[in-house]
Every structure is written in C-alpha cells, then in structure tokens.
Amino acid sequence: MEMASAFTLNVRLDNIAIITIDVPGEKMNTLKAEFASQVRAIIKQIRENKELRGVVFVSAKPDNFIAGADINMIGNCKTAQEAEVLARQGQQLMAEIHALPIPVIAAIHGACLGGGLELALACHGRVCTDDPKTVLGLPEVQLGLLPGSGGTQRLPRLIGVSTALEMILTGKQLRAKQAVKLGLVDDVVPHSILLEAAVELAKQDRPSSRPLPVRERILAGPLGRALLFKMVGKKTEHKTQGNYPATERILEVVETGLAQGTSSGYDAEARAFGELAMTPQSQALRNIFFASSEVKKDPGSDAPPAPLNSVGILGGGLMGGGIAYVTACKAGLPVRIKDINPRGINHALKYSWDQLEGKVRRRHLKASERDKQLALISGTTDYCGFAHRDLIIEAVFENLELKQQMVAEVEQNCATHTIFASNTSSLPIGDIAAHAARPEQVIGLHFFSPVEKMPLVEIIPHASTSAQTIATTVKLAKKQGKTPIVVRDKAGFYVNRILAPYINEAIRMLTEGERIEHIDAALVKFGFPVGPIQLLDEVGIDTGTKIMPVLEAAYGERFSAPANVVSSILNDDRKGRKNGRGFYLYGQKGRKSKKQVDPAIYPLIGAQGQGRLSAPQVAERCVMLMLNEAVRCLDEQVIRSVRDGDIGAVFGIGFPPFLGGPFRYIDSLGAGEVVAIMQRLATQYGSRFTPCDRLVEMSERGESFWKTTATDLQ
C-alpha cells in the first residue's frame, strides 16, 4: 500500500496552487529526505501548468507549519561526507522552490523552525498569523549544528547580517510582530484569514525585498563586516567559552557568503554542516534532545491518570507564587492559593501579574489574555474553595511537623480523591505521609527556582504512593510545561544529592586558598552556566546549604562540609543575592553593578595558603564527585535510568549540555579513565574521591552506560 504524501497539490479556480503540508500520522510536520521526490513532482506539475498565477505553502496541522527537519536523518549519517550530501540536497530543493517563475508564498501558522523556516525563506513572500503559537527561528545551534538548507545565506540578505547572526547564533525564536518588524514576514493576519491573505499576495508580482536599515547596509560592507564579525566573535567566545564549535562555524559561513557570494556561501554551509554533525558536541546535544522527548512521553506509571480540573497551593511565597503562575498560565488550570497571611496571597498574585505584564509590555501577550489568565488565580486564608480541588501542592517552610499538619488539614478539608504533592527539597516524602489517612495520595513534587524558568521537576513517590497518583502528578507537570523525572524517596532525591558534593568541594578549595573568581571561572569554562560559589549566592546560601546536614546524616563523611565554614558565613548574615550579602558584593537592592568578590569572605572562613590549582584541576575535583554520586544514585535506583540521570543534571543544575549529562560524559571519558582520575584524587585529597563499586566494575569489564544508538540503554 502506497504511503500517503506529506505534500499535496490542489489548484483553485483562481489558478492559485495550494501545496498542503501534512506529514501522515504525526502531530508535527518535520522534513524528511524522502519528501524531496514528492516536492519535486509538485514543482514539475507547477512548471507544466502555464495557467497558474501563484503558489501557497500551507500546513494542515492545527498548531505548526514545519517544526524543522527530522533529526534522525543526521543520526543515520556515518560520515561528514554523508551529512554534507544531506545538506546539499536540502539546498538544491530550496533553490528549485525559489526558482519557480511565479510568486511562491508561505502561509505560516504555529512553529516555523529550522528547515521549516528555510523553506519559508526560499519562498518569495511570507504571511503569518498573530497567534502566540506562531514562532519563527533557526534553532540548529542548540543541536550543535548550523542551518544546512540555505538559511545562513538567505536570512542575512533578508533581514540584515547583525540581526540574522543574533537569530542563528542563539536559536532565538521570533513572534509574529517581531518578524514583520524585521522584515522576515510581509504581513501578519488573524488565523481565520491566513490562507486568503497568502493567496492575495500570490496573485501579485513577487514581493520586492524591503530595503535594509542603514545600519545593516553599513555592516554588510567590507569595513562594517570586519568590525561586526570581530565584535560578535569576541562576544560569542565569551558566552560559549569555546565549548560549542557550531558558533564559530556559523560566523565563518555567514561571512564567507557575504564576502565571496552565495555560491561560496552555500558550499561553505554544506561542508560545515557535515563536519559539525560528526562532532561529539552535536552528538551529545542531539542525544539530550531525544532523551528529553522520551521523558516528555513517559507517563510515569502504567496506571491511567486521574482527571485534573483544578489545583490548590499552600503557601504564597516565592515558590508558591511561581507554581501558581505555571499552573494557571501554562497548564490553564484554575488555582486557589491558601496562605495564613493576606500579604502572602498578594505576593503570589503580584508575581503572576509581573510575569504577564512583562509579556504584555513586550507585545508577546494581549492585555485581554493577561486578564483571562490572571482570573484563573484566586486566594484565601482558609480552606474555602478547596473542597473539590483535584491536587494540592504544598509550598510551605521546610519543617516536617508543619508539612504533616498540612497533610492532615488537606485530608480534612478536601475531597477523598485529592492528591497531596509536597514541594519539599530535602524532607523524606515517607515521613511527610507518616500520619496520613490516605498515604497512597501523598507524593513529592520538587520544583526548582525560579519556577517559571527551570524546566525540570522531580516527582518523588514514597513506598505507599499509588501508581495513579504518580501518573496524575506527571500529567500535571507536563501541563505546566515541565520535564518530569520520577526519583526514589531518598535523602536529597537526585539533583540536590549530586549537586551537594560539587558545591562542598568548591567551598573546600576556598579554605585551601583558591580564589572565588578562579573557582567559578573554572567551572564556567568547563561548561556550567555559573560557577558553584555564584550559584550558592543566587539560590541563597541559607537555602543551598540547608540540605547538607541531612545528606551527611544519610550518607556519611563524604557529604561533610569543611568544618564551621558554612556556619561562619551564615552567622555573618550572608544569604547571597537576596539580602545583598554573600560571597560577592552587590549594589543597591541586591543588584550587582559589576560582579566583584567580597574580600572580607576569606578571613571569615579562615582560608589558608595560596591557591595553586589550574582551572582544569579545579573543575576536575568538583565534577568527579558529581559523576561518582550520579552513578551511586543509579545503583540505588534513585533514578530509573541513565536517561533520567542525564536529563536531571542538564535541566536541573545546568550540567554542560554539550557533554550530554553525567553518564554520557563518563562514557566519553571511559569508565577506566574516570576510575583512574578518582583514585589519583583519593590519594591526594582523601577517601571522598574513592570511586563507587559500580564504576570500578564497569572499568574492569570495559562497559558503558549508553549503547551507541541515540536513545537506548544497556
């Protein structure tokens, strides 16, 4: 039986050809190599029909135009030459679309990304909807690649080189109003008239290119170009620390096209695409993409989730306010916040107002939509309005007795089916549920701060949590736009447990005389978004260190922090950015004017000696402890798989994505090399570096955590 076509041609009575994109059996349109013959057959029909006046590409999917190319095509390439051929085939197809003698218009609704935008760029004009779902971008850099079907050449000529570089180097996605302002699209219309607007444009002569702003024209010239690429190159190097080769190749390819012409530019683009596809960085980033996609499809348990119609939140603090925001504004669920103090409720409501008002100011959201979303959030100082809530998220202080009291109150004031989810970061869920009448409906739901930005949540069932409670909580997390991993109810869960020894070691190096800025710079160079000391300042020194005694009590000496250091810092009223006193100096209202270390910190913690470690040595000490603890978590079934372990570290603490996560990084080094490094460090610095049994066994057997395929585990 012949497979249904992803591209179909229909000719209207007014002689406008409509090419409908609808990949069979898929929610999202993605471009695959086998579609090229379908498109070429349509192009042939269009060329043969001399009556046609214009062509419109439109998607049949409800919320996407084309979300990009199928990444599996790249994974199937065994050599750089094969990947280069793939890029050249894409370039050729786009060139054939662009060469059609009649106007070709892209009618865009929903995601128009990667290869989808490259197809739209090959058209002569573009119309998009004003819907919030409509975004346009070239996110290939986030996979360690560059646009390979002409995007690096067409985009700079359409919107200007500096604007195009910003889009390509960051993967930035534009909304409709931004796109039309920059000249990326010709018109923005309501969804209801998208097709007709595109048809009207197709009936006219080919849309003429909008003149570029004077600034962009100057930057495209030889002198402006030299200055621009030097400046952008420096900025990019500082941001990536040289860890992402794709950014360097993007600059090279775009500059080649501008200096030597499009023919040389396309050639450079295809070669760079092929070479980047084979880099370990791209392979790791693509593996993270696949693992993330799998996690988002994982229901958490085999049981069907219960209905979710409304949510309650206990506590209107920073976490409670953030959770209310993602529940109402991302999940679209009515939220009722309970706080003992009206000020807490006001704080939570203001939090959502500030987030939404910011979107209105940036023209990402209409004021009417802001008001509609805010109307989903209400507050109370008692349990009025909680009787029929399906799930309650507790976000009160980290106090076991208080949380147990919250369980009792929810069971007394809510329905018998109501799930109680605790946002604890350190307390065992089994202890929180110890006196519950319905312990099967108690679970942990650990968000990370700031809630609206951090993509990960840990879902923590205790021994008696039901499968349906797990599935329902996973369902909620996904609705909130989060990536959930299910972890075992052990001290520190997963993310905080692997983070603690990493931070402890940084503090220990401080006491040995290493400078704060040297330690942080070393870990940023390694690939973390911020260093461990700055991270403590950002999350709050009191908050970040509160779990340390819990972990030391559970796992022993390897989690012990340097004696009296943390207490000395806290006793000096240093909580980090939030109170303007931490390891770093802060300006008014806790804002940093320029990041500078507070020199008073060194005598305060009793730092001894002069630091002599190189940046790689500093990073090695912190990272090896994190890797070792991640393997212990896998061994103890704290995490269900190495997939979850890698996703948890990358999305939860910013483990360098280009390394693929702790387990992929161990595989890239080899278990034998990791064991050898740790044994050397154990000899130098103590038994906390002793490699765990599983690593030693894997080293002896030559085993790895991941198979060579993109997503399968051993």
UniProtKB/Swiss-Prot annotation:
Stretches assigned to coiled coil: none
Region listing for Enoyl-CoA hydratase, in residue ranges: 1-190
Key words of the record: Cytoplasm, Fatty acid metabolism, Isomerase, Lipid degradation, Lipid metabolism, Lyase, Multifunctional enzyme, NAD, Oxidoreductase
Molecular function terms, GO-annotated: 3-hydroxybutyryl-CoA epimerase activity; enoyl-CoA hydratase activity; long-chain-3-hydroxyacyl-CoA dehydrogenase activity; NAD+ binding
GO cellular-component term (any): cytoplasm
Subcellular localization(s) per the UniProt record: Cytoplasm
InterPro entries assigned to the protein according to its UniProt record, in alphabetical order: 3-OHacyl-CoA_DH_CS (IPR006180), 3-OHacyl-CoA_DH_NAD-bd (IPR006176), 3HC_DH_C (IPR006108), 6-PGluconate_DH-like_C_sf (IPR008927), ClpP/crotonase-like_dom_sf (IPR029045), Enoyl-CoA_hydra/iso (IPR001753), FA_oxidation_alpha_subunit (IPR050136), FadJ (IPR012802)
Catalytic reaction annotation: a (3S)-3-hydroxyacyl-CoA = a (2E)-enoyl-CoA + H2O; a 4-saturated-(3S)-3-hydroxyacyl-CoA = a (3E)-enoyl-CoA + H2O; a (3S)-3-hydroxyacyl-CoA + NAD(+) = a 3-oxoacyl-CoA + NADH + H(+); (3S)-3-hydroxybutanoyl-CoA = (3R)-3-hydroxybutanoyl-CoA
A Pfam entry, by short name: 3HCDH
Domain of life: Bacteria
Signal peptide (UniProt feature, chain positions): none
Pathway the protein contributes to: Lipid metabolism; fatty acid beta-oxidation
Listed PROSITE patterns: 3HCDH (PS00067)
EC annotation from Swiss-Prot or TrEMBL: 4.2.1.17, 5.1.2.3, 1.1.1.35
Function summary: Catalyzes the formation of a hydroxyacyl-CoA by addition of water on enoyl-CoA. Also exhibits 3-hydroxyacyl-CoA epimerase and 3-hydroxyacyl-CoA dehydrogenase activities.
Description of how the protein assembles with itself and partners: Heterotetramer of two alpha chains (FadJ) and two beta chains (FadI).
Name assigned to this protein: Fatty acid oxidation complex subunit alpha
Source organism: Escherichia coli O127:H6 (strain E2348/69 / EPEC)
